[in-house]
A protein has these predicted regions:
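Short beta-strand segments enriched in small/hydrophobic residues
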Residues: 138-149
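Structural motif
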Residues: 148-176, 210-221, 261-276, 316-326, ...
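Acidic/hydrophobic-patterned starts of short beta strands in beta-sheet-rich repeat architectures
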Residues: 255, 313, 352, 396-397, ...
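Beta-propeller domains
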Residues: 320-323, 329-354
Length: 490
């Protein structure tokens, strides 16, 4: 008898595998077909939303990216609605839609983005993509002099953080104050702090008296000084010197200041120096030709500031020439005529507001074109006309004042647009004077710094209504670092 199995019995396991494979493939095909049918009937769906809450309130041209679950036909600006309304543009590619906002949004606010008529290529069904985003809140860094014993909201004493350490009362303190919470946190403290600025995840701090300045870079962790990281002490151009007019590039790649050699007891070689944070961290003079040059005699400076969101600086020289300097040294400087004062920048930073011998103009930094600044009735009817601070492309605030019978100045703040000027209802004590008015990065708030014979105070007010949001017993806040500095007027 033969022991061989029939051929069909040997093939039976293979046939069983084939049947299972065919069945599985059939299920996958059916599932895919059903999904395709459902997708064709329902239209695309929202899969993901990405955005930077802090960037949306501090910088223009920030994007919210909506990602769908499939490729999309082109989406136009007319298909997108933002509530509350905010100027925006729209681009789409593949399965993503980018909503780019023209300017910073309001702090701590919800915005709904709706996209209608969304369709996949070749599919008849349309759908609506809808999402709600929440913007970030804001805070300020304020300099509290050593003589101050309180900070935070008016009437609230003490601070949190490291403010309770021994000896803190004898030191100046840089504190962080959030507008959506009471109290303040000490970020850094040292003797004789004169200026400071945020530099990425660090602080640049200038300190010293009697023409002997020091410049330190302080690492931060959790928003306060990192105790595990040593403070970096910069080597200055001479053994003794005075540092003023500190400014930092928005990207944190560099910072600069006005420096005067005081080794002889007099100020010599006063001019602009910049520090490249990607290089040696050594201050380099900006030469008279407008180029950073090691060892050069520096360009004289009356006022200067970084152009927002660039590595360029706008400089008014000691002879009132205007020069646009590339701090990185990659492009040649551009000379833009002359001016008697730099007020600040408009919107995205391509336009500056400057004072000339014939009036205040808007200077286009791309082509040098000058146009008169809007000055409706009531905006210049005062004996004293102070600094202009732009809130947006069309609106600015300005400190003006009249002389009282006793010779003191009665100051007020005007809010000015193209057609009218109105007084912002901000109370200035009779015994105090306004030393600075500085907009928040999105123009929603103003920091109004006042000084009396006995105290310093910074009031944070709504830029539209003048309503008080917070107050700090401090001399200055970091918002003012965006304004050109040098020879100052309020």
């Amino acid at each position: 008898m033969s022991t061989d199995r029939p051929p069909q019995l040997r093939r039976r396991p293979r046939d069983r595998f084939r049947r299972r494979l065919v069945a599985s493939l059939t299920v996958f095909v059916l599932v895919g077909a059903v999904a395709a049918v459902i997708g064709a009937q329902q239209g695309p769906r929202l899969r993901d939303v990405t955005y930077d809450p802090s960037g949306l309130v501090s910088r223009p041209a920030q994007r919210v990216i909506l990602t769908a679950n499939q490729a999309l036909q082109r989406v136009s600006a007319g298909d997108v609605t933002v509530t509350p309304a905010a100027a925006h543009t729209v681009t789409s590619s593949g399965n993503t839609i980018a909503v780019e906002f023209a300017g910073p949004l309001a702090y701590d606010r919800s915005y709904e983005i709706a996209v209608t008529g969304v369709r996949a290529p070749g599919q008849p069904a349309t759908s609506e993509l809808r999402t709600t985003i929440r913007t970030g809140s804001t805070d300020v860094l304020a300099l509290v002099p050593a003589t101050s014993r309180t900070s935070g909201t008016s009437g609230t004493s003490g601070t949190s953080g490291t403010s309770g350490t021994a000896g803190s009362a004898d030191k100046d303190r840089i504190v962080r104050r959030s507008l959506d919470a009471g109290g303040a946190t000490t970020v850094y403290q040292a003797a004789d702090i004169t200026e400071y600025a945020r530099l990425g995840r660090s602080l640049v701090v200038v300190s010293g008296t009697d023409g002997r300045s020091a410049v330190d870079i302080v690492s931060l962790a959790g928003g306060v000084q990192d105790p595990s990281a040593p403070v970096e002490h910069l080597t200055l151009p001479t053994a003794e010197g005075r540092v003023t007019a500190l400014h930092v590039a928005d990207d944190g790649a560099s910072f600069g200041f006005e420096y005067a050699d005081t080794t002889t007891g007099q100020s010599r070689d006063v001019g602009l120096y910049v520090v490249d944070m990607t290089g040696t961290h050594l201050p380099t003079a900006v030469a008279a030709d407008g180029k950073p040059t090691a060892g050069a005699v520096p360009m004289t400076v009356a006022q200067w500031a970084y152009v927002p969101r660039t590595e360029r600086a706008l400089v008014r020289t000691g002879s009132d020439d205007l020069v646009l300097v590339d701090v990185s040294g990659q492009t040649d400087p551009v000379r833009l005529g002359s001016a008697t004062y730099l007020h600040g920048f408009v919107g995205t930073g391509t336009t500056a507001v400057v004072e000339t011998g014939t009036g205040v103009v808007r200077l286009d930094l791309t082509d040098g074109k000058r146009t008169p600044l809007a000055a409706p009735p009531g905006s210049t009817d005062a004996a004293y006309l102070g600094r202009i601070a732009q809130l947006d492309d069309d609106t600015y605030v300005r400190v003006v004042g009249d002389v009282r019978p006793d010779g003191t100045l009665a100051q007020r703040i005007l809010r000015v647009d193209a057609s009218r000027a109105s007084r912002l209802p901000v109370v200035v004590p009779a015994d105090a004077s306004i030393t600075a008015v500085c907009p928040s990065p999105n123009g929603q708030f103003l920091a109004v710094a006042t000084k009396s014979a006995t105290s310093d105070l910074v009031s944070i007010v709504d830029a539209s209504s003048g309503a008080l949001e917070a107050s700090i017993d401090a001399a200055s806040v970091d918002w003012c670092g965006a304004l050109p500095s040098g020879d100052e007027i309020s």
